[in-house]
Amino acid sequence: MSTVYTFQTFQQAQAAGEQPDFIRRFVQQHCTSGPYKMALDADLYDAQKNPGAERFSQTYALMLKRLSKNTKQDTPRPDMVKSNLFRRLNKQRATYSLGNGVVFADDGVDKDKLGQNFDEQIQKAGYFALIHGESFGFWNNDHLVVFKLTEFAPLYDEKTGLLQAGVRFWRLNPDTDMHYILYELDGFTEYTESRIGNVMQETTSKQAYKSVTVTTPGGGLESVEGENYSALPLFRCGVRPAPEHPVGLKTYNRQHRSGDVRLLQ
């Protein structure tokens, strides 16, 4: 039985000095999970492709070739099964919910402090939540950054279900190094895994999310101090499942979810 990685198992690995190895194994499991694979398929549908029909047509063509004892030519796969309905529909759903921007009930909120493109980033988070099932927002000092499920592995508390930490990961090309950023309540740490030998090293030790620079009256630099937030600067944007829709619907994947986009802890 595979290990279920939670914030508690992360703390255990951290106490045992196995944090880098845990991060590698955790991300590997995330990339083999059902939600991650479905999110990859959703990206293909979003690009006006149809992976479900493509796989079926490939299997069908291979079956015909075997029945003909490899004498039959490959059956061409029709392009008519592809359309932009998936992207168009979800763009409309995201625009319907978030197209007018965010409005705060408290008139005292200074929205300008949230960044110039805050509304666009919220709409982006909502769109990825619609097609992937969930997305994640990271408050980076003075602006919002959106992470997709295909680039961010969340760590939830096994008792409360709350998001307590997470790992962002990326590799620019198959022949380049893998990069990780671990986000915790008390700061972030960067790691790099070499392509050759799979050696994982800490490239940036844990740093605070904010840097406070103190200067002298004359303008000289006196000190630079780190400061963190009172809570983890990450949030989950999820779409509540609608059980009345067929979960197994593959032709236009992810349409079984309702349009109720929610920001979740």
Region annotations inferred by a language model:
Residues 1-144:
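Extended, helix-rich architectural segments
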Residues 21, 38, 56, 103-105, ...:
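Intrinsically disordered, low-complexity, compositionally biased regions/tails
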Residues 30, 46, 71-73, 149, ...:
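Residue-level detector of alpha-helical hydrophobic segments embedded in or interacting with membranes
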Residues 37, 53, 78-80, 156, ...:
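Intrinsically disordered, low-complexity segments enriched in proline/serine/threonine
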Residues 43, 92-93, 125, 179-180, ...:
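Generic hydrophobic, helix-prone segments enriched in Leu/Val/Ile
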Residues 43-45, 81, 186, 192-195, ...:
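Intrinsically disordered, low-complexity regions of eukaryotic proteins
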Residues 116-219:
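Extended, Lys/Arg-enriched charged tracts that mediate electrostatic binding to polyanionic substrates
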Residues 210-265:
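Extended, charged amphipathic alpha-helical segments
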